[in-house]
A protein has these predicted regions:
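Left-handed beta-helix
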Residues: 4-79, 84-102, 110, 131, ...
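Active-site loops and adjacent core secondary-structure elements that bind or stabilize anionic groups
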Residues: 1
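Double-stranded beta-helix
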Residues: 32, 111-145
């Protein structure tokens, strides 16, 4: 994945809107999608977005949890790369350290959490027919979204 930056001279930022509109007219996803997105629980970075899969790096802040959720159109595979994650999968709870992974089947209720004092970093690989954020069905959410 290529990273792109838009650099403009000081005092010429009024041209940014025109550049964005031109990118949108050419259907460039860089105009509408952001690599980093911040959430109440931490943040994620989109590493790869293809027709076959989507890959994200999730960083869960200490003491925070993602919503209990499921998906209609995708399964996920989580690999913990830093810290110790708490994972709820159905009625089971798992504690996963760096180097460990877990499969989240399509339709399975799941949640990711961090009950430690250090950030947890997880690589999430999504596989299925659709990867939009609107395929998240929240069962319960500590942030009431």
């Amino acid at each position: 994945m290529y990273k792109r930056q838009l650099i403009v001279r000081k005092g010429e930022t009024e041209h940014v809107k025109a550049v964005i509109e031109q990118l949108k007219s050419r259907d460039e996803t860089v105009a509408t999608e952001h690599s980093f997105e911040y959430r109440p629980w931490g943040m994620f970075e989109n590493l790869l977005d293809s027709a076959a899969c989507k890959v994200k790096r999730l960083t869960v802040d200490p003491g925070h949890h993602l919503s209990l959720q499921y998906h209609h159109k995708r399964s996920e595979h989580w690999v913990v790369v830093a810290g110790t994650a708490t994972v709820q999968l159905g009625d089971d709870r798992h504690t996963l350290g760096a180097g460990h992974s877990i499969d989240i089947p399509l339709g399975a209720h799941h949640a990711l959490g961090n009950d430690t004092d250090d950030p947890v970093v997880v690589i999430e690989v999504q596989m299925g027919s659709y990867f939009g954020e609107d395929d998240i069905v929240r069962v319960s959410d500590p942030y009431e979204r």
